[in-house]
Amino acid sequence: MKLTLVQIFFMMLLLLLGLGVGLGLGLQMAAAVLEESDQLLDEFLSSDSQDKAEATKEGLDSQSTETLLVSNKVVPPEDTIVNEDDVGGDRMLRAEVLSQSNKHYLRSDVMDRECNALMAPNLKSKDHPCIPQYVFIHEEPDTVKAVCKSPAVACDLKEGKCHKSPRPFDLTFCKLSKSGQVIPHCNYVTFILEKYILMSCSDMKVQITSKS
């Protein structure tokens, strides 16, 4: 069977049309895939940016909580303590040993170490001056009592007789944010420390020291 030129022409035309339609469909499918990929990428980037923003906000919230605990200043401190080594200075401070029966004994929960909460039971006399500085010792009572069995060392008491802890003790140091405050309007700055202490066993006063 012989094909005429007209038949060959029509066959080639149909073939070209078929290729054109197939190519068009292929391009449409490729464009759809690319568009879907772009949408997925945009969603991923948007989600990633949102996660980073949330993480940043959480970090700022955590930092604010920590700063509030450590500083806790409603009234700006009159004498700012800039270094842990300056806490307490060379003065003998009133101290209290917190036993396990005390709700503030827990060392792991720093929110239980906030000075305004710790100091509240000691501030009963209304219109009396606030206690300027105070130390809470978060150790077993027997551990603290054992310090009194150690050799006596010199300290800033009149008698000059104190006893030194064998290791740094877990302490909460409370400092009045501004002098002149009276009960019940006492506001304290909180410092959580691990320091050696010099202790007078007669009247339970301590001196905080960094020296081993």
UniProtKB/Swiss-Prot annotation:
Superkingdom field: Eukaryota
SMART domains noted in UniProt: RNAse_Pc
Cell compartments where the protein resides: Secreted
One of the record's GO cellular component terms: extracellular region
One Gene Ontology MF term: nucleic acid binding
InterPro entries documented for this protein: RNaseA, RNaseA-like_dom_sf, RNaseA_domain
Tissue expression pattern: Male-specific expression in proximal caput of the epididymis.
PTM (free text): The N-terminus is blocked. Glycosylated.
Main location class: secreted
Alphabetic keyword roster: Cell adhesion, Fertilization, Glycoprotein, Secreted, Signal
Keyword ATP-binding: no
Pfam families: RnaseA
GO biological process, one term: defense response to Gram-positive bacterium
Signal peptide limits: 1-24
Role description: Secreted proximal epididymal protein required for post-testicular sperm maturation and male fertility. May be involved in sperm adhesion to the egg zona pellucida. Does not have ribonuclease activity.
Family assignment from sequence similarity: Belongs to the pancreatic ribonuclease family.
Name under which the protein is recorded: Inactive ribonuclease-like protein 10
Source organism per UniProt: Ovis aries
Gene encoding the protein: RNASE10
